[in-house]
Design a protein with these regions (language model features):
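Fe-S-dependent hydro-lyases/dehydratases of central metabolism
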Residues: 1-211
Length: 211
């Protein structure tokens, strides 16, 4: 038998019982027109989703527990990353070529989002991972000049202005506020992807556009 949905007032009163390793799904925040964030991690070429979100028997039991999974994020590259990312509030990751290659696991985007990552700037992205970042509310940008990768160092305070206008134009500017230097970055997004990011991810976008 097909059961019709409960009326809204009854549905709101339904209590969802979760096991100890099932936590509520995290949601990103909508983008303001300016993002100021710390460069919390710089990685090289061919970073895989296994680097970002390791797999294996130790981690598998927590697949529905994003807060617990966050303790393992990028730890194969930098064991201090989870704590530093949470402390930074808003964070940016800089990567080399083919960032996010390998398994298409969504956790490699959802977990960094939970840790406060708002943007990844790379020389290039693996296509599926770039789409997952967008759905998680993380802005994927590519260097217009790949050599600019060398100039950015962890700990820098970075700013991106006029995000809405820049998304539509396909170009934004990344500014190192302490060094006073700016770097052009490319923003290759469809109109729908722009709307998803501005809403703070696919879940927020879907809620806004639900009938």
């Amino acid at each position: 038998a097909v059961l019709p949905p409960a009326p809204a007032d009854e549905a709101d009163a339904v209590e969802v019982l979760r096991g100890p390793n099932i936590q509520p799904f995290p949601q990103s925040r909508p983008f303001a027109d300016t993002l100021t964030a710390e460069l919390v991690l710089k990685v090289g070429d061919n970073i895989t989703t296994d680097h970002i979100m390791p797999a294996g028997a130790k981690i598998l039991p927590y697949r529905s527990n994003i807060p617990k999974l966050s303790e393992f994020c990028f730890t194969v590259c930098d064991p201090t990353f989870p704590a530093r990312a949470k402390a930074a509030g808003d964070g940016i990751i800089v990567g080399g070529s083919n960032y996010g290659q390998g398994s298409s696991r969504e956790h490699a985007a959802l977990v960094p989002m939970y840790l406060g990552i708002r943007c990844v700037v790379a020389k290039s992205f693996a296509r599926i991972h770039a789409a997952n970042l967008i759905n998680a509310g993380i802005l994927p940008l590519t260097f217009e000049n790949p050599a600019d990768y060398d100039a950015l160092q962890p700990g820098a305070r970075l700013r991106i202005d006029d995000i809405r206008t820049g998304m539509a134009a396909g170009k934004l500017t990344l500014t190192d506020t302490a060094a006073g230097k700016s770097y052009p970055v490319v923003c290759s997004l469809t109109e729908r992807q722009q709307a998803i990011l501005l809403a703070g991810g696919l879940l927020n976008y879907t809620k806004e556009h639900a009938l």
